[in-house]
Amino acid sequence: MKKKMFILISFIFCLSLMLPISIQAAQKKESVIYSDFLQENPSYTWFRTLDINKDGVKELIVSKKELEFSANVYYVYTIKKNEIVYVGKVSHSRAFKDGKSKVIFYNSKLKAIREALTSPRGFGLNLYKISGSTLKETVRMNRSLGRFPVYSIGKNNKDKYYTTASDIKKFDKLVDRYFYKGCKKYVLYKNTSSNRAKYLK
């Protein structure tokens, strides 16, 4: 009995030593795949990695050089079976640009990245998570102004509208919780050889 227990403990100990090594090996392979991809696609002038769905595989978020008055578009890639796979994209309208920096906003609780869109009569914020190999909307907010203003927050394709003054206060708190305080800003890096070596680890 003692011998079996000793063998079991030894096996668990060896496994615990092997696991970090296998994770490091996977991360190294991941960094090589992303580095090669960025070198082959120089039009992606900005990049960073972020484990959006917290599955141990970092996603690659890239962006191109945009015109000053156009939206920033962020393209998301991941790795499936040692192949790079396009997941989707999110946009930040000009009003939501962070100066000349390229930034992405991430809600770690919902495992989702933020999109910000504007129109002549209002704006909308969306949170997208990874489902399979695509980006899927998880929470959305719409605020349109004008003669008949609309305040709504949607989950699972169902929108809730806020009409009274007290309702709108609740709306503002939810927007803050989901899209502002609930999100952390991550800065993208210029796609240079030194930055690839530094940040793709």
State where each predicted segment sits.
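Beta-propeller blade repeat segments, especially FG-GAP/WD-type strand-to-loop junctions
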Residues: 71-88, 125-133
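Beta-propeller blade termini
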Residues: 43-52, 97-112
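Acidic/hydrophobic-patterned starts of short beta strands in beta-sheet-rich repeat architectures
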Residues: 54-64, 107-115
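Repeated scaffold domains used in trafficking and secretory/extracellular systems
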Residues: 94-104, 146-151
